[in-house]
Structures are given as structure tokens and as C-alpha cells.
Curated annotation (Swiss-Prot):
This protein's name: ATP synthase subunit alpha
GO molecular function, one term: proton-transporting ATP synthase activity, rotational mechanism
Substrates-to-products reaction catalysed: ATP + H2O + 4 H(+)(in) = ADP + phosphate + 5 H(+)(out)
Upper taxonomic lineage: Bacteria, Pseudomonadati, Pseudomonadota, Gammaproteobacteria, Enterobacterales
Keyword entries, A-Z: ATP synthesis, ATP-binding, Cell inner membrane, Cell membrane, CF(1), Hydrogen ion transport, Ion transport, Membrane, Nucleotide-binding, Translocase, Transport
Entry's family note: Belongs to the ATPase alpha/beta chains family.
Site (Required for activity) residue list: 373
Localization of this protein: Cell inner membrane
Length: 513
């Protein structure tokens, strides 16, 4: 077949017109060094702080140090096969995690990937792990309670929805037990829970998950795990990932509770990363921004106004406030609350529950020290009945501690002092509570009423715990309607007072403890 020049030129024009080229521009760099999970990259001129960098093998690193001629990034996951000369690319994205109701009942890692063997996670989208906390105008004052189920906490150190309450104490003083019981107590409250395990043994986390499942609380809980075997980067980011999952509920007019267990290990992981990135060390070798590490996390726990929720949901949710309540845990060394990280977190939070090893070893559990434990905003959130009945408890314990120390030196004590010491011992005994046995508002109110109105005076100290158990069993059997009314309303008036008095009078008459 012979083509003339005109046909050839027409064919070339046609092909040129149909030619389509798609070009993709990537900001590409080269790894110049790899050590201890930190990579140095040359050539990423347009990288953002905190941006995800795509590595070979479908992995990512996060850019943390932006220097004049190189970028310091921390690898998310294994790094043994990374080598000098490998090419990496910018993604233009900040780290995001999946959020939504589909995560409830699941155990996930820092990146939101399932690690419980139950298949893929259903989610409603992705949310950046780093979010700016709601502003002052978007917030609302704390005035609704979060019941932990512990008498000593709900009576003396009440927690409100949207509050940040620190749980602080030495190792093996019951910090995790208190937090896990608080989650178990939310089964029927409608509060969604997030438990973030940072730097813990896998066996410990497995036990927590099993206990939550046994008590029917796992279906209402998201467990985020960055265990001790995970990289420092994942341990550092885990609290922010958990917080993003909690904010999903807060911003849609619901209530959520998040436990950070514990932030001491997160600070250690961040210190490790900072030192490997050659940032200048400060006090206790922590970097200069370790306060900001925790403040930007804990400020995201808040109670937001109905207007904020309405604007966020584009009018889908109206007239509802949302809240995210945080219970960060800090581990102290030999009770030293004046160390760097504990003082930082104490100053950020709205109060602290201080657990003492001396009390724990003496069998007083939860080992709460009421003298230095405080809730700065929770008092406004207490139910009326708890506020009315708990007033004398803290005073009685404070006087008891003072007199107990004094009585060791005094040989003969007057009757009034003996009476106060006796009452203090019985209140201390009454506030003891076993793990995984949270109490309802009505049950707590009944116990506190017995202590307040002198019903324990003729009960031997060794019989206080059996007395309380028998009283609660009697009340739930004979006066279930009264307990239900108190749980639903939380009010306290002369009628309720008379009914409580009647319950205790009738019970004391049975002598059945």
C-alpha cells in the first residue's frame, strides 16, 4: 500500500491531536541515613511538619525535624530493611485514623488497624490525629456527672462530663483498676469509652480486654494499643489517635470517656524520639516542648456547646451538647509528685486522684488519699443526693487522719476524740470496695447515709463491710422502687430522707449482718 505525503501528514496530525499525556509531579527525596527508627532524607524541599512520607514497601514515616538541608522523620513500623539511597515521596497528607461507631468493641493499633482477629474495621471516615482543641466560646461549663462506681471517688472527688481528672500514683497502686472499673460502670450510661494502652505488656492489655468483655463493657469501648514492643513513634502517637476517635462522638452531641494508660510512658517515648532527632534536652533529658505534648492532647477533652455541635453536623443534631472526659494516668517514682512530668500534668488537668502505696498495702482499696486528691470542677456536676450526703465524709476522714497521727503520742484520749477516731475508722472501712464491683448512685447514697446519720456507731469495725453488703442486699430486695427512683432522679428532699431513714431503721431491726 502506497501512501502519499498528504495522507501521511494528515495521519500524523490526527495522532498528535489524539495524544494524551498524564503527568504526575512527586516531591521525591533520598534516604541518607537510617538508625534506631529515625531516617534522614535529602531533597524533600516542600515537606510539611507532621506530613506522612511514603517509604518503599507500603510504609510511612512522619516528618518531625525540618532542617536546612535534610528532613528528620520517624518510621511508623519496622525499619530493618531500609537503606541509604532508597527513594521516598511526599504524600501531602497528615496522619489520619479511622473513626466511627464501627470501632466500638474492637481492639486496634495506633493507625486504627484491627489487631483482634475479627476482620476489617467498619468506619465512617478518617480524622487527623492532631486537631486544634475547641475554643473558649465553643465550650460549656461542666454540670453533668460521670459516675465511676467508687464511693470514695464519686463522693469526695466527683468527675464531670468534659473534665480532665488525673489518676496518679506509684506502680501497683490500682490506677488501671480504677480506670477499668470506671469504663465498666458506663455500660448503661450511654457514655462511649476509649481505652488507650501505651507501652504496656501485651499480657496486661489482654487481661484488661478480657475483663471488659466479661462485664459486658467491651461492646461500648474502643481499645487502642501501642504495646511495649511497638516503636516509640507509635507509643507517642497512640493518645492522639485515641483522642481523635473520642472526638467523633463529642462533636456529634454524644458523651465519651477516654483513659490514657499511661502518659508517663508516652513522655518517655517522645523523649527517645527527640533525643534521636538530636533536639536539645532539658530537665530530666525531656525536650523543651514536653509540656505542650500533654497540654495539646488534654485540652481536646471538653464539653462543647449545642451551637458547636449544630454547626459541626450542619444542623443534623440540634439542642445537644457533646463531651469528651479524659482520665490520664501518670506513674510516680516513690510517691514523688514533684517530678517534671507529674507536675506538668497536674497543672494541665482539673484535679487529681492520688493513690498511695501505703494505703494500698494496708488493704484500703481503692487507695485514694483524700487529703491531696481534689476535683476542681466536678463539684458542680455532682447529683444533689451525693452532694448532700458526701459533705461530712471528707471532713471526717481529714479529722481522723490528723487525730490518728496525734493519738500515737497521747496516752489517754477524751471521749470526743475516741468517738472521732472510731467514726473515722468506720468511714475508712466503709469506703473500701472490691475491683469489678462498681456501685450505683442509690447504693452509694444508702452507704453514705448510714455513715452520716450514725447508723455505724454500734457496729464493730470488723463488721462494717458485712453490714454494708447485707444492707444493700436488703434494700435491693425490699426497697427496689426507692433505689430506682434515686438512680433516675438523683434528687434529695425530706421525703427521700425519710424513706432512707426507714430503710436503715428496718434493716437495723433485723440484726441480719
Amino acid at each position: 500500500m502506497q501512501l502519499n505525503s498528504t495522507e501521511i501528514s494528515e495521519l500524523i496530525k490526527q495522532r498528535i491531536a489524539q495524544f494524551n499525556v498524564v503527568s504526575e509531579a512527586h516531591n521525591e527525596g533520598t534516604i541518607v541515613s537510617v538508625s534506631d527508627g529515625i531516617i534522614r532524607i535529602h531533597g524533600l524541599a516542600e515537606v510539611m511538619q507532621g506530613e506522612m512520607i511514603a517509604l518503599p514497601g507500603n510504609r510511612f514515616a512522619i516528618a518531625l525535624n525540618l532542617e536546612r538541608d535534610s528532613v528528620g522523620a520517624v518510621v511508623m513500623g519496622p525499619y530493618a530493611d531500609l537503606a541509604e539511597g532508597m527513594k521516598v515521596k511526599c504524600t501531602g497528607r497528615i496522619l489520619e485514623v479511622p473513626v466511627g461507631r464501627g470501632l466500638l468493641g474492637r481492639v486496634v493499633n495506633t493507625l486504627g488497624e484491627p489487631i483482634d482477629g475479627k476482620g476489617a474495621v467498619e468506619h465512617d471516615g478518617f480524622s487527623p490525629v492532631e486537631m486544634i482543641a475547641p475554643g473558649v466560646i465553643d465550650r460549656q461549663s461542666v454540670d453533668q456527672p460521670v459516675q465511676t462506681g467508687y464511693k470514695s471517688v464519686d463522693a469526695m472527688i466527683p468527675i464531670g462530663r468534659g473534665q480532665r481528672e488525673l489518676i496518679i500514683g506509684d506502680r501497683q497502686t490500682g490506677k488501671t483498676a480504677l480506670a477499668v472499673d470506671a469504663i465498666i460502670n458506663q455500660r448503661d450510661s450511654g457514655i462511649k469509652c476509649i481505652y488507650v494502652a501505651i507501652g504496656q505488656k501485651a499480657s496486661t492489655i489482654s487481661n484488661v480486654v478480657r475483663k471488659l468483655e466479661e462485664h459486658g463493657a467491651l461492646e461500648n469501648t474502643i481499645v487502642v494499643v501501642a504495646s511495649a514492643s511497638e516503636s516509640a513513634a507509635l507509643q507517642y502517637l497512640a493518645p492522639y489517635a485515641g483522642c481523635a476517635m473520642g472526638e467523633y462522638f463529642r462533636d456529634r452531641g454524644e458523651d465519651a470517656l477516654i483513659i490514657y494508660d499511661d502518659l508517663s510512658k508516652q513522655a518517655v517515648a517522645y523523649r527517645q524520639i527527640s533525643l534521636l532527632l538530636r533536639r536539645p534536652p532539658g530537665r530530666e533529658a525531656y525536650p523543651g516542648d514536653v509540656f505542650y505534648l500533654h497540654s495539646r492532647l488534654l485540652e481536646r477533652a471538653a464539653r462543647v456547646s449545642a451551637e458547636y455541635v449544630e454547626n459541626f453536623t450542619n444542623g443534623e443534631v440540634k439542642g445537644k451538647t457533646g463531651s469528651l472526659t479524659a482520665l490520664p494516668i501518670i506513674e510516680t517514682q516513690a510517691g514523688d509528685v514533684s517530678a517534671f512530668v507529674p507536675t506538668n500534668v497536674i497543672s494541665i488537668t482539673d484535679g487529681q486522684i492520688f493513690l498511695e502505696s501505703n494505703l494500698f498495702n494496708a488493704g484500703i482499696r481503692p487507695a485514694v488519699n483524700p487529703g491531696i486528691s481534689v476535683s476542681r470542677v466536678g463539684g458542680a456536676a455532682q447529683t444533689k443526693i451525693m452532694k448532700k450526703l458526701s459533705g461530712g465524709i471528707r471532713t471526717a476522714l481529714a479529722q481522723y487522719r490528723e487525730l490518728a497521727a496525734f493519738s500515737q503520742f497521747a496516752s489517754d484520749l477524751d471521749d470526743a476524740t475516741r468517738k472521732q477516731l472510731n467514726h473515722g475508722q468506720k468511714v475508712t472501712e466503709l469506703l473500701k470496695q472490691k475491683q469489678y464491683e462498681p456501685m450505683s448512685v442509690a447504693q452509694q447514697s444508702l452507704s453514705l447515709f448510714a455513715a452520716e446519720r450514725g447508723y455505724l456507731e454500734d457496729v464493730e469495725i470488723s463488721k462494717v463491710v458485712p453490714f454494708e453488703a447485707a444492707l444493700l442486699a436488703y434494700a435491693s430486695r425490699e426497697h427496689a422502687d426507692l433505689l430506682k427512683e434515686i438512680n433516675q432522679t438523683g434528687t434529695y428532699n425530706e421525703e427521700i430522707e425519710a424513706k432512707l431513714k426507714g430503710v436503715l431503721d428496718n434493716f437495723k431491726a433485723t440484726q441480719s449482718w
